[in-house]
Amino acid sequence: MVQGLPGEFEDYLYRVIASLYRYAERLVVVDYPSSPTRRSIDLIVSLPGSRVVLIKAIYDASLISKKEVEELSAVANSLGVSAVIIAERMGREDLLTGVVYDRYGVNMVNLETFENFVSGREEVYVTRYKDIYTVSISSEKLREKRLEKGLSLGHLAYMLKTSRKSIYEYERGVMSPSVEKAEKLVDILGEEILEPIDILTSPRKPVSKRDFDKPEEALVGEKLLELGFKVSHAKRTVVDLVAGRSGEEGVGSRIMIVVKRSREGRERMMSRIMKGVKMGSILSSSLYAVVNREEKSLIKDIDYTKTIVKDVREFINDVSRGRVEENEE
C-alpha cells in the first residue's frame, strides 16, 4: 500500500511499480515519509544478476531537491548498491528515451529507457549533463581502431575538426565526444568504439552525508567509521543511519539503524522499524534500533518485528568486537 500521495504522484509511482514487477526478483515500496517530494527512496528492487537498486520515482524530477538526490546517492554508496531516478519530465521538458541524464550525480532516465535497459532490449549510449549531450565510447577501442587505420592523433583531430588534445582526452577516458563528433568517429572507425552506459553505475562520486542530528547518532556513526564502514546519515527515509563495508558480503557487511527521533512517539517509531525490516530483507542488511536506556521501555515488545534492540553503549561494544547480529527470519 502506498499512502499519502497526491493523485499524479500516486499514478506514476504505481505505473513504475507495475512495470518493474515484470523484471524484478523482489520489490519493496518505501512509503516514508508520506510526502513524495521529501522522500529520498521510493522503491528498492532486486534485479537479475544480484543487482539491488534504490529508486526515486517521480513524474516531474524538478520537484525533488538536491538534498533528496544526494541522500539517495549516499545511502546507496554506503550499502554498496545502485541508485537511479525514474521520471518523465524535468519541469516543462520531457526526458528523451535512450538518454541518461545526470541529476546531482545520480543517473536519471524515463521509464521506457529503464525498461529497455533491464530487459536487454536496447542499449543506451547518450548522456546529458546540464545542457550538453555526449556519447559513451570505449577509450581502449578508440585507440585500437585509430592505430589499425594508421591515423595519428593529429590526423584524426583534423578529420573531426577538433583539437589533438580532445582526441587524447577521449583515449584517456576523461572526456566524451559530443553527439556530432561521435557520429563522425563512428563513420571513420566503426561502431565498435561505442560503449553502452551502465545505468546502474553512478556518473560521479557520491557525496557523504554525515550531518548527525543526535549525540547517539554521532557516537554510533563515528564508531562505525573508525571500524572501516562507509556511513551515511539519512533524514528522508525510514532509517537514520546506514553503513556498509566495501566488497564484503554476509552478516555484518551492511547495517541499518533506527534511532528515536525528537518528539517521536512509540507508534511512529514502531512503524519505521517495521518498514526498516522490509528494507533490510531485500538489502541483506541487519536492522538495529539503537536507543538510550530510558527509551528501551518504549519498545519493550519489539521482538515480533525481529529487530535487534541495543542501547548506544551495547551497540558500540558489540561492533567494536566484530559482533554484528543478523535479524531473525
UniProtKB/Swiss-Prot annotation:
Q: Extract the InterPro entries matched here.
A: Arc_TR_HTH (IPR020886), Cro/C1-type_HTH (IPR001387), Lambda_DNA-bd_dom_sf (IPR010982)
Alphabetical UniProt keywords: DNA-binding, Transcription, Transcription regulation
Among SUPFAM superfamilies, the record links this protein to: lambda repressor-like DNA-binding domains (SSF47413)
For this protein, what is any one GO molecular function term? DNA-binding transcription factor activity
- A Pfam family for this UniProt protein? HTH_3
Q: Which residues bind DNA?
A: 153-172
UniProt KW Flavoprotein keyword = no
Cite the HTH cro/C1-type domain residue spans from the record.
Answer: 142-200
The record's listing under HAMAP family reads: HTH_type_cro_C1 (MF_00584)
This protein's name: Putative HTH-type transcriptional regulatory protein APE_0778
